[in-house]
Amino acid sequence: MSSQPFWDERIHRWRCLGSEGNELIYIDEEQTWKDYDPNSLKMNKAGSTGAEVSDVTAEATEGKESSNGEDRHTKRLYESTSAEGYPSGSRNKKSKSENSEASPAPVINKAVYIQGLPLDVTVDEIEEVFKKCGVIAKNIDNGTPRIKIYRTEDGTPKGDALIVFFRSESVELAEQLFDDTEFRYGSGQKMRVQKANIDYKKEKTVNKDVGGALKKKALRLRQQQMQQISSWDDVDEEVDDKRKKRFNKIVVLKHIFTLEELDKTPELLIDLKDDITEEAEKCGRVTNVVLYDKEPDGVVTVRFSNNEEAEACVRLMQGRYFDGRVVEASIYDGKVRFQKSGKHTLDDEEDEEKRLEKFADWLENSN
């Protein structure tokens, strides 16, 4: 019966006693057990140095390991040997390599492929249109945008192109904004915008083995693009602040009516407007109430003189029942354009409110 393998520090190999009483040694390079012969040239080539062979020869004359030593090595074995009887170091190395091959790092797609472009389109035109989706990546060597217009062998544009963005989020935005739209308005020719095949990464024009100067240039270019993104965020925040100040006095109420009710009773609009005005005035001065008779959600907007009154109205109306329906109340975000009969819009209401305020000021000053 074979003994448990143990680690031999002198030759830096695993050893054990075979079933026939012969000594075995584990060869990492071949991942197998072989007969141990300290004088063998083959063993010397397998990893033992001349000094190690001398030590092993001396060990052979001294006899086998003592029982205490074997117990000690056996304990070490249980901590570092796999269930199949192989040294865990060799097995782990193999497992790690297998795992790395089985689970490659996820590839991030930052490019879109566009079809249906005008044949005379230029890189500048494409950049001008698609920069609305985010920062377009730059070529490190010359700083030009990473936009490739595909051409035939004689140099004629084929009507398709590739754009590489700085951030992956721009890809989805480009699809949403421009897929099935005209590149040039009125041309009748619609684009097809979709995620690019990941093989585009093989088309990079800069060698990976770049010098230090080019690496610094790449880092500087990346910092500039990050600053550009940051400045866009600042602009977006500024626009959001202005929008909030402009529309935070308007409350949107939903589920006040149904389109079927309005069809059956057109005069219901007047009654609803009076009822809502009366209820909303509990929160402050109401300057305008508009019912959007083309909205299936039964939308009504109420404009107050300030934001505090509008917030109070939201608290009052949110979740209340109106003719058997639960009312949704919120501050208008300025993004949605509700539909109603005629051309009257929220912007028209604001202009009308300004005119009324000026007229009120004129009356006060004239007196």
Curated annotation (Swiss-Prot):
It comes from the Eukaryota. The keyword Transcription does not apply. One of its GO terms (biological process) is mRNA cis splicing, via spliceosome. Interacts with the U2AF large and U2AF small subunits. Has a role in pre-mRNA splicing. InterPro entries: Nucleotide-bd_a/b_plait_sf, RBD_domain_sf, RRM_dom, TatSF1-like, TatSF1-like_RRM1. GO terms for molecular function: RNA binding. Residues 61-78 have a biased composition (Basic and acidic residues). Signal peptide: none annotated. This is Splicing factor U2AF-associated protein 2. GO terms for cellular component: U2 snRNP; U2-type spliceosomal complex. Keywords: mRNA processing, mRNA splicing, Repeat, RNA-binding. Residues 112-193, 268-329 form the RRM domain.
